[in-house]
Structure formats: structure tokens, C-alpha cells
Regions:
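N-terminal nicking endonuclease/strand-transfer module with a His-rich metal-binding environment
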Residues: 1-173
Length: 173
């Protein structure tokens, strides 16, 4: 039986967070945050079962070539010292699915609910062979176009849309 877990949070500089550090942790990799000059290395972790970036077709290729490129650009274009740089969530994946279907389910959910609305989704799959298969997803807060990031879309902060996102996952999973 699937266990429902989906909780949205924000990466906030005012809380000492950086989207680059969060991305490095999720993707179990090593990324240097160009803004602060600090390197975050989680490559020793062994529970990663795949990683993908999903982006609108209008997103410039140089921004979506890697998590490092994406989140360093997000940090670069956020001008506020106490700014918010990403939305993120963890989602429990039904254990009954095979690993390919687990990945497909999360990717389809992210495409439908976020990427098709203009966000970039950075997805890391963890512990797919365990009793706790889950994905970590980071989402951009600003619109993306051929020229790069635009303004933040404040409608994405509406509690009603977050309820819709949760309902969508409950229906799809």
C-alpha cells in the first residue's frame, strides 16, 4: 500500500540556505556555489537511483545542462540578500511499482504540474529498491524563457495551487 507524503518548502537565503547546496545533496554530487565560493560534496552517498532535469522547451540549453549550471544561474539572478531561490519537496513513491515506473510516475507528475506551467524541475530518485522509495524535487521560482529567467511567478505561492498539486499526486500515485 502506498504511503502519501508530499510537503512543499522554500530554499531561503535568510535561513542560511543555498539552492546549490540543496541540489548537490539531492543529486549526491559535488557542486561549487559560484556566488559564495563554497563547494558542497555529497558524492560519497550511495542511495541515488537516477537524476533528471525537466525544463520547458524555451529554456536556454546552457542553463539546463546540469544541476550545477541551473542552480548557480538561479543564485546569480536572485538579487535579494535574503531572497528565496527554489521550492522543493520530497515525495514517497509507491513501493509496488518497478523502478522504471517509479521514475516515470514522478517525471510525468512534474511535467504536468510544474514544467508545463513554466518551471524547471530537478529530480533525484533515492532508495528505489528499499521500503522507502522517494524522490527529491527542486523547482525554480522564476519564469524561464529563451533569454533566461524572468520574474518570480507569485501565483505559484498560492495555497490553493499547492492543494491542487497534492491532489494531483494523490490521483496519479
Amino acid at each position: 500500500m502506498a504511503i502519501f507524503h508530499l510537503d512543499f518548502k522554500i530554499v531561503k537565503r535568510s535561513e542560511g540556505m543555498t539552492s546549490v547546496a540543496k541540489a548537490a545533496y539531492h543529486a549526491r554530487t559535488r557542486i561549487t556555489d559560484d556566488r559564495i565560493g563554497e563547494t558542497f560534496d555529497f558524492s560519497h552517498r550511495t542511495d541515488l537511483h537516477g537524476h533528471i532535469l525537466l525544463a520547458p522547451v524555451s529554456a536556454p540549453a546552457h542553463i539546463v545542462e546540469s544541476s550545477s549550471a541551473l542552480w548557480n544561474e538561479v543564485e546569480r539572478v536572485e538579487r535579494q540578500n535574503n531572497g528565496q531561490t527554489a521550492r522543493y519537496f520530497d515525495v514517497a513513491i509507491p513501493v509496488e511499482l518497478n523502478n522504471d515506473d517509479k521514475k516515470k510516475l514522478v517525471a510525468e507528475y512534474c511535467q504536468k504540474n510544474f514544467v508545463d506551467k513554466g518551471m524547471i524541475a530537478d529530480i533525484a530518485f533515492h532508495d528505489l529498491d528499499s521500503k522507502n522509495p522517494h524522490a527529491h524535487v527542486m523547482l525554480t521560482l522564476k519564469t524561464i524563457g529563451p533569454d533566461g529567467f524572468g520574474k518570480k511567478d507569485r501565483s505559484w505561492n498560492d495555497k490553493k495551487i499547492m492543494i491542487q498539486w497534492r491532489e494531483s499526486w494523490a490521483t496519479m500515485s
